[in-house]
Amino acid sequence: QAIGPPYGLCFQCNQKTSSDCTEARRCSPFHEKCYTLYQPDENWMKSSGLSHFGCGKQCPTAGPEGRVTCCLTPRCN
């Protein structure tokens, strides 16, 4: 199973819908960038907000109160 271009290997889960974010999985072809999208909770506290881990062709854009980290390995997400 090839890892690396054109395939990435990233953590892919949403803390809101899944508590198991422990295993990186192969991304779709040419979705090589791993990202973590941080979103604040209902009280707008970033420290206790939820995270979405995924992979894409490019990094997603965070909303006004969120932030994104992005890289080429699952170590950053």
UniProtKB/Swiss-Prot annotation:
Modified residues (Pyrrolidone carboxylic acid): 1
Listed Gene3D superfamilies: CD59 (2.10.60.10)
SUPFAM superfamilies per the UniProt record, alphabetical: Snake toxin-like
Chief location category: secreted
Cellular compartment(s): Secreted
Membrane-crossing residue ranges in chain numbering: none
Keywords for the protein's UniProt record, in alphabetical order: Acetylcholine receptor inhibiting toxin, Disulfide bond, Ion channel impairing toxin, Neurotoxin, Postsynaptic neurotoxin, Pyrrolidone carboxylic acid, Secreted, Toxin
Protein function: Potent postsynaptic neurotoxin. Displays readily reversible competitive antagonism at the nicotinic acetylcholine receptor (nAChR).
CDD domains per the UniProt record, alphabetical: TFP_snake_toxin
Highest taxon of source: Eukaryota
Annotated GO CC locations: extracellular region
Listed GO MF terms: acetylcholine receptor inhibitor activity; ion channel regulator activity; toxin activity
A matching Pfam family: Toxin_cobra-type
Disulfide bridge positions per record: 10-34, 13-21, 27-55, 59-70, 71-76
Protein name, UniProt field: Alpha-colubritoxin
Family of this protein: Belongs to the three-finger toxin family. Ancestral subfamily. Boigatoxin sub-subfamily.
Tissue: Expressed by the venom gland.
PROSITE patterns hit by this protein: SNAKE_TOXIN
Secreted among keywords: yes
